[in-house]
Amino acid sequence: MWLAVNIGNSRQHWGWFTGTKLVRTLDFPLTHWDAQAPDAAEQIVVASVTTTHLERWRTLPHARILNLADVPLSGTYPTLGIDRALNLIAAADAYGCPALVTDFGTAITLSAVDEFGRFCGGAILPGLGTQLRALEHFTAALPAVDLPEPWPPLLARTTQAAIQSGVVRVTLAGLAQFLESWKRQYPGGISVATGGDSERVHRWLPDLFDVQDTHLTLWGICVAARGAD
């Protein structure tokens, strides 16, 4: 059994694989460390959007740190986040091309491959939770607000609900327009949602994306590791 580790901006995600079969996952804050878990894995493959949290992994002799050059994706640029590249090779492997992956994390990233599996660009904007925290941090009177569980009302009658409506409805309306434009440019392409907020977005708008795949990045690590063997 081997361990895939996806380190994001605020959380880390672990997936235990037997060969290419994902058998168990864990998700927790970056500050948490399960000292027993790495010892139970025959091999560890780590991908991180930042170098800050890699030091402890580098001390493990059976751990391999993935770089962008290890990801079999053409057309990339040097500062492309490895998570975006891994998402794309995972989507291409699991669902085919063209593909557009929207990753709902601290940032919302949209990344696309064409019909030949080549990276062809994308977009980045603040994540839903990041937008909510920014309003609290950068204004004098707006309160801290969590993401709503039900779909927020269009015309809210409280400040909290108005913030939720603005962040959620307007952000997802913009994403829907982006997806529509991409579908016109790439007819027959598949859109995939992943990331921490993707399950909630799927509950709100189940038809917005063709596929919701919580563990897409972990599968991308598996594809990259498989290609390197």
Swiss-Prot record:
| Residues given in the record as substrate binding sites | 77, 81-84, 159
Which residues does the record give as K(+) binding sites? 103
GO CC annotations, alphabetized: cytoplasm
Q: Where in the cell is it found?
A: Cytoplasm
Reactions mediated catalytically: (R)-pantothenate + ATP = (R)-4'-phosphopantothenate + ADP + H(+)
Pfam families, per this entry?
A: Pan_kinase (PF03309)
Tell me where on the tree of life, at the top rank, the source sits: Bacteria
Q: What is the UniProt remark on how the cofactor binds and its stoichiometry?
A: A monovalent cation. Ammonium or potassium.
Gene Ontology molecular-function annotations: ATP binding; metal ion binding; pantothenate kinase activity
What's the chief localization of this chain? cytoplasm
Span of the secretion signal?
none
Give the transmembrane ranges. Answer: none
Its Enzyme Commission number?
A: 2.7.1.33
Q: How does it assemble?
A: Homodimer.
List, alphabetically, the HAMAP family matched: Pantothen_kinase_3 (MF_01274)
This molecule's function is given as: Catalyzes the phosphorylation of pantothenate (Pan), the first step in CoA biosynthesis.
Tell me which family the UniProt entry assigns to this protein: Belongs to the type III pantothenate kinase family.
UniProt-recorded name of the protein: Type III pantothenate kinase
Source organism per UniProt: Gloeobacter violaceus (strain ATCC 29082 / PCC 7421)
